[in-house]
Design a protein with these regions (language model features):
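A short, N-terminal "cap"/entry segment at the start of jelly-roll beta-barrel domains
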Residues: 1-45, 55, 126-133
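Conserved short histidine dyad/triad with adjacent acidic residue
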Residues: 44-60, 97
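Residue-level recognition of conserved beta-strand positions in structured domain cores
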Residues: 45, 58, 77-79, 105, ...
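A short hydrophobic beta-strand segment most commonly corresponding to one strand
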Residues: 46, 65, 94, 109-126
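Short, conserved beta-strand element in jelly-roll/cupin
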Residues: 47-48, 60-75, 118
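Histidine-centered metal-chelating micro-motifs
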Residues: 53-55, 74, 93, 97-103
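Beta-rich strand-turn-strand
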Residues: 79-86, 104-109
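Short acidic-glycine-tyrosine-enriched beta hairpin
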Residues: 81-97
Length: 133
């Protein structure tokens, strides 16, 4: 259930899996489903098939936390994309504002991440590579 960012949320909201929508902003190699969006909050799920690698992107003025619920998430970042972390189920990955990165799924099964973002502006900005931006 996407909420109009211009309308404040009043009260508790329940969003069931079938109510999530395809997020407007996508990156090749992964699928994002939006559950909640307000002026300064974005919550959803991202899925990546085994062996897939997303394109390089960043999240502008949004701080991002990813919680790994299935599979594994390799996140490449840093100068030239030479740094990486690999999150397993139960791990959290923090991505600061504007950090150019890409995700891949090195596991044999599908990767699923719960994503929570706080900030504003465009949620996803796709770029040509780790040195772009």
């Amino acid at each position: 259930m996407t909420m109009d960012p211009k309308q404040p949320i009043s009260g508790v909201k329940l969003v069931r899996p079938e109510e999530r929508i395809m997020a407007a902003a996508q990156t090749a190699g992964m699928i994002r489903e939006e559950a909640i969006q307000t002026d300064h909050l974005w919550v959803g799920i991202a899925r990546t098939k085994p062996g897939n690698i997303s394109n390089w992107h960043h999240h502008g003025d949004w701080e991002t936390v990813a919680y790994v619920i299935e599979g594994a998430c390799r996140l490449e970042f840093g100068h030239g994309g030479r740094e990486a972390v690999v999150g397993q189920p139960g791990d959290y990955i923090y991505i600061p504002k504007g950090e150019i990165h890409r995700e891949s799924n090195p596991a044999e099964g599908e990767q699923a991440l719960v994503i929570v973002r706080f900030g504003g502006g465009p949620v996803v900005i796709n770029v040509d590579g780790p040195m772009a931006g």
